[in-house]
């Protein structure tokens, strides 16, 4: 009996010694939330994943005298179809999965609901997809509650509309110079939600001031699968340009049918689906000449970090990142704030996030007093991209520097669809 006890004691001692020096690595849990079955959520995840891999490989995040590895938690929000599902997903991420930080989101209504959950729990939440201005104005209206919210991407709806109007102006100038149509007719096609409604209001107010005529407004569901009726009506209205505001899956059937029918109107604006390489295959090549606002394009260099990131993303995932992959910069911004704070305490990290002055992949990222990302020359501007014969290329800001003297290497000329030229050329 004594012999058995000695053996057991020795076995325990061996196990104890074997365990020495193998302290479990400390981790920081970051929840990445979005519609994971769609490119928006996929790119939220891919962007964060790439940053986390780079940071962990380089040693992790230094917090005081401790070093932490990043642990990402993928959270499917299903927000394109259900705000309630999105809210529940955010709550599970925080209360069940135990994430310390949250980033992602795409649909403004859903992000607003998720924002409330994060604020209830004093969890820092980085917006990486929703553009509604109201998400950030809450910060100044009730700072103590909403100070944990920051938007990294995209720029807000006001600036999005401004960039969209620059793309519209570019197409209109081509129509004026090449086709001799001095007052182009514009059809507004925007999905029916907060984002779409905001864009419609802005477009109705701005387009006439740009020397163009609005011939109608069409607002399909963001999840529409057939836009034949809308496109037929737009053609019947005699539109020369379709100004789009599409963040949801409807962007694929829209562009495919536009190209198939060869609707004689240039398509410009925002079509998130067209920001992804899979768009070409998904539309069977019929999305050729579609133009959309984006953040990234092959061979376009906004900062010294842009091309290395895009190239790495393509090498890893096989596609060009959409703006939702701004989670990549977000993880690095969070790392910097945590290390400057020397703490994981949310209030301490917020103080450092407010000081952010970070040259990232889309430009210099600085937050204003509403915790919104600053837009304009010297900061984040976004770019215009167009599908040209199977390649997604950058076309705005123009290569001649005519927009506020901003020039990015790799920009090429915008092209009108040949069927538009054939229809309207005198």
Give residue spans per PLM region:
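Short, low-complexity disordered leader/linker segments with a strong preference
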Residues: 1-29, 94, 419-426
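Short, polar/charged alpha-helical segment
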Residues: 41-63, 201-209
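Segments of small-molecule ligand-sensing domains
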Residues: 312-324, 335-402, 426
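Extracytoplasmic ligand/sensor domains, especially the bilobed periplasmic-binding protein
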Residues: 99-215, 266-292
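Extracytoplasmic "Venus flytrap"
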Residues: 31-49, 75-83, 106-109, 189-198, ...
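Immediate post-signal peptide segment of exported/extracytoplasmic ligand-binding proteins
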Residues: 20-32, 62-71, 175-184
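Extracellular/periplasmic periplasmic-binding protein-like sensory domains
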Residues: 132, 136, 154, 258-328, ...
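Beta-alpha junction/loop-to-helix N-cap segments that form part of ligand/metal-binding clefts
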Residues: 22-25, 40-46, 61-140, 152, ...
């Amino acid at each position: 009996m004594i012999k058995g006890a000695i053996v057991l004691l020795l076995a325990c001692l061996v196990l104890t010694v074997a365990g020495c020096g193998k302290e479990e690595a400390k981790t920081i849990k970051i929840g990445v939330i979005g519609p994971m079955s769609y490119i928006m959520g996929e790119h939220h995840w891919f962007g964060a994943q790439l940053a986390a891999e780079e940071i962990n490989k380089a040693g992790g995040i230094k917090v005081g005298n401790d070093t932490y590895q990043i642990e990402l938690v993928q959270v499917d929000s299903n927000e394109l179809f259900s705000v309630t599902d999105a809210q529940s997903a955010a709550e599970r991420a925080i209360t069940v999965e135990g994430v310390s930080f949250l980033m992602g989101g795409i649909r403004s209504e859903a992000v607003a609901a998720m924002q409330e959950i994060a604020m209830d729990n004093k969890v820092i939440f980085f917006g990486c997809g929703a553009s509604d201005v109201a998400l950030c104005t809450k910060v100044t209206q009730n700072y103590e509650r909403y100070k944990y919210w920051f938007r990294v991407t995209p720029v807000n709806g006001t600036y999005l509309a401004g960039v969209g109007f620059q793309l519209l102006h570019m197409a209109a100038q081509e129509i004026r110079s090449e086709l001799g149509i001095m007052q182009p007719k514009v059809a507004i096609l925007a999905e029916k939600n907060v984002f779409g409604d905001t864009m419609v209001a802005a477009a109705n107010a701005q387009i006439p001031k740009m020397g163009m005529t609005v011939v109608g407004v069409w607002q399909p569901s963001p999840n529409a699968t057939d836009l034949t009726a809308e496109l037929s009506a737009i053609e019947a209205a005699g539109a020369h340009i379709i100004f789009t505001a599409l963040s949801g899956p409807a962007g694929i059937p829209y562009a495919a049918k536009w190209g198939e029918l060869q609707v004689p109107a240039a398509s410009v604006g925002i079509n998130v689906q067209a920001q992804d390489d899979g768009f070409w295959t998904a539309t069977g090549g019929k999305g050729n000449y579609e133009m959309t606002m984006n953040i990234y394009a092959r061979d376009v260099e906004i900062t010294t970090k842009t091309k290395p990131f895009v190239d790495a993303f393509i090498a890893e995932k096989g596609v060009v990142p959409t703006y939702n992959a701004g989670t990549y910069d977000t993880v690095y911004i969070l790392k910097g704030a945590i290390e400057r704070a020397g703490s994981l305490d949310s209030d301490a990290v917020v103080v450092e996030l407010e000081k952010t002055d970070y040259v990232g992949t889309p430009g210099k990222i600085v937050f204003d007093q509403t915790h919104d990302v600053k837009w304009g020359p010297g900061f984040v501007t976004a770019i215009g991209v167009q599908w040209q014969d199977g390649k997604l290329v950058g076309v705005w800001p123009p290569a001649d520097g005519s927009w506020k003297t901003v020039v990015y290497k790799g920009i090429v000329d915008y092209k009108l669809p040949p069927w538009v030229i054939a229809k309207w050329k005198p």
